[in-house]
């Protein structure tokens, strides 16, 4: 039986994202195969990675909370997409970079610091009308992100010139300081203050981007909203985040969807819920009524003798299942019976006759006794 992901990370089920991230960092540091050579450490590390992969994303976490491991089988973004973590190297860099011989401060890491860097992911919150969420469709959005400067092709240098290798760090992006103590020598590694860790110095900056290599650009995008989305659904638009640095790929744009409330309809999973009001005579005798659905007006049969709060079902008139729009939920209508507070004399006379036939007593205040018994 699979272990509980919250138990694996050692956090409560109501832990917030930061608590989950901190727990993951602590355990990843302890069980990473490059650090922990004990038997079983690698499997434990994979287990920790999978738990974080599910619990760090609101969408997969919600599915896991509701359905357990079966609800997220095959789910997850993959560790390579966890941009907010910066990768395994960044986690361990913060732990080991201050010490020589830590295994994380060698030439490979120096090249990585000055090499291509992926752009940041961006988030956009988008509101949808109720029917837009039900049926999906195309939506135009406006975003502002960093794009590679066309003038300097992202180098940050004026056309015709090139950045030079930083003389302070020799292009590594890092400077080292050796401290000698009675316990031995320690090497502290920090970001080069001259080039800010890039390993390159721009002497003649590009006028178009002021040496940054990127420009802030506002643009319009058309995105496809799948049928059946709900509050909190996340769409990933690849390579529409901020531009990368030094030739690195751009990040992604994550669009979080939020659905406006509807005056008539509510939603419960893939079912649509609404109410319909009928007169007490329609409830007693039965009738045919036209009711509104997300697909438009539909005829509904109210059977004779329908009781208050009876739920009528219109099959396949609900919300399409996300990822499988052929499958739809139902439309559930709660019947509310409108009992009048006042009746005309002719109507009262007829009702009193009916009450006598049924043997019901009527009070001074009207026909509560009769109508109350009628719907028992």
From Swiss-Prot:
It comes from the Bacteria. CXXCXGXG motif repeats lie at residues 149-156, 166-173, 192-199, 206-213. Its cofactor is Zn(2+). Transmembrane segments: none annotated. Zn(2+) 1 binds at residues 149, 152, 206, 209. It is found in: Cytoplasm. Binds 2 Zn(2+) ions per monomer. Zn(2+) 2 binds at residues 166, 169, 192, 195. A zinc finger (CR-type) spans 136-218. SUPFAM superfamilies: Chaperone J-domain, DnaJ/Hsp40 cysteine-rich domain, HSP40/DnaJ peptide-binding domain. Keywords: Chaperone, Cytoplasm, DNA replication, Metal-binding, Repeat, Stress response, Zinc, Zinc-finger. The J domain is necessary and sufficient to stimulate DnaK ATPase activity. Zinc center 1 plays an important role in the autonomous, DnaK-independent chaperone activity of DnaJ. Zinc center 2 is essential for interaction with DnaK and for DnaJ activity. NCBIfam families: DnaJ_bact, PRK10767.1, PRK14293.1. Participates actively in the response to hyperosmotic and heat shock by preventing the aggregation of stress-denatured proteins and by disaggregating proteins, also in an autonomous, DnaK-independent fashion. Unfolded proteins bind initially to DnaJ; upon interaction with the DnaJ-bound protein, DnaK hydrolyzes its bound ATP, resulting in the formation of a stable complex. GrpE releases ADP from DnaK; ATP binding to DnaK triggers the release of the substrate protein, thus completing the reaction cycle. This is Chaperone protein DnaJ. It comes from Trichormus variabilis (strain ATCC 29413 / PCC 7937). The gene is dnaJ.
């Amino acid at each position: 039986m699979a272990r509980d992901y919250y138990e694996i990370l050692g956090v409560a089920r109501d832990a917030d994202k930061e608590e989950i991230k901190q727990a993951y960092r602590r355990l990843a540091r302890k069980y990473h195969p490059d650090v922990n050579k004990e038997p079983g450490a690698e499997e434990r590390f994979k287990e920790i990675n999978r738990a974080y992969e599910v619990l760090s994303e609101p969408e997969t976490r919600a599915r896991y909370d509701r359905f357990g491991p079966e609800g997220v089988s095959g789910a997850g973004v993959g560790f390579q997409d966890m941009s907010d973590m910066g990768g395994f190297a960044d986690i361990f860099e913060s732990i080991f970079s201050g010490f020589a011989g830590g295994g994380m401060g060698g030439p490979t890491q120096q090249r990585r610091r000055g090499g291509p860097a992926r752009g940041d992911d961006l988030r956009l919150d988008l509101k949808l009308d109720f029917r837009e969420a039900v049926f999906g469709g195309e939506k135009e959005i406006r975003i502002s992100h960093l794009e590679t400067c066309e003038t300097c092709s992202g180098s940050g240098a004026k056309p015709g010139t090139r950045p030079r290798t930083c003389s302070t760090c020799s292009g590594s992006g890092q400077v080292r300081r050796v401290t000698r103590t009675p316990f031995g020598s320690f090497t502290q590694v920090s970001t080069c203050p001259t080039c800010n860790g890039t390993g390159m110095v721009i002497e003649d900056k590009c006028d178009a981007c002021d040496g940054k290599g990127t420009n802030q650009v506002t643009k319009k995008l058309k995105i496809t909203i799948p049928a059946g989305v709900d509050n909190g659904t996340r769409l990933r638009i690849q390579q529409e985040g901020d531009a990368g640095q030094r030739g690195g790929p751009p990040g992604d744009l994550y669009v979080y969807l939020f659905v406006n409330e509807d005056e008539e309809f509510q939603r419960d999973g893939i079912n649509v819920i609404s109410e319909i009001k009928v007169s007490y005579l329609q409830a007693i005798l039965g009738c045919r009524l036209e009711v509104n659905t997300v697909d438009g007006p539909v005829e509904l049969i109210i059977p004779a003798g329908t009781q208050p709060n009876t739920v009528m079902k219109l099959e396949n008139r609900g919300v399409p299942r996300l990822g499988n729009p052929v499958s739809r939920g139902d439309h559930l209508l709660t019947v509310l019976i409108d009992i009048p507070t006042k009746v005309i004399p002719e109507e009262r006379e007829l009702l009193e006759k009916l009450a006598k036939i049924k043997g019901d007593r009527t009070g001074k205040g009207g026909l509560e006794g009769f109508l109350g018994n009628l719907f028992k």
